């Protein structure tokens, strides 16, 4: 990341991320199509779960941004021990976040969140079923996002494209099988959509871990890097918290939109959910470019190559 011509480097780093995010956005659209075939109530329930899903992602994704910046900067400075600590501490923080989400679900947070947006018992049941599973098994999402960030931080975005793409494809394949009970699987309805998501995320996380262990010599995995250090945590969240807040604001806005639309009809909420996912399809290339640029800037900032930053 410190020698390749900047324009070529940004394209090399960003293009795989843009492609993988487009595949992710396509999955979101296909997922909505399958859920909609169950019933309007099912689609509305899943739509009402979306703001809290986004909030969960904001915590893990924002932590990932902090890891990305600290790790790439440390590599630029040739501080390899510091880079290892950023990776290890970041993974631990993401697992802690997943445990908090799981505990919150066991305490009834999923049901309370859905019921705060609708009084329809069928919609509430569908939404609670979906959100409870996503929260309890959020370790899949947390692991995938964080482990993929380690590949991004070290300039290996091609591997990230493979893991994200595979996760989304598995998700698309498993959705109809688990939702409608095909090929001997039980018909699980919206629960099937949630389980398909978790399966895709978990397989992507395992593949990303394999790539890190076998193809990423910049990070040296050992037990010592997983011991939390306050200084490392502070540095991760110094960059990560603004990112968390930015995504969380979008989550709050979506929640408020849902409250307004449920006053009209459940159909309005379902349509808004589909529109939101369609809209994200067009913004994903920008997010991919952003994810490709961050490690380039951080690495060259650490290496004190200001001409490449400019």
Describe the predicted segments one by one.
Residues 22, 26, 99, 103, ...:
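Hydrophobic alpha-helical segments of membrane proteins
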Residues 8-68, 72, 241-263:
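Signature of the first transmembrane helix
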Residues 17, 25, 51-54, 89, ...:
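Residue-level recognition of pore/gate-forming positions within transmembrane alpha-helices
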Residues 105, 159-188, 202-208:
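Alpha-helical transmembrane segments of multi-pass membrane transporters
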Residues 43-106, 141-160, 271-310:
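Small-residue-rich hydrophobic transmembrane alpha-helices
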Residues 22, 26-44, 114-121, 177-188, ...:
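Helix-terminus/linker motif at the lipid-water interface of multi-pass membrane proteins
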Residues 15, 31, 67-68, 109-110, ...:
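Hydrophobic/aromatic residues in alpha-helical transmembrane segments
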Residues 1-14, 71-139, 186-241, 297-310:
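Short alpha-helical transmembrane segments in multi-pass integral membrane proteins
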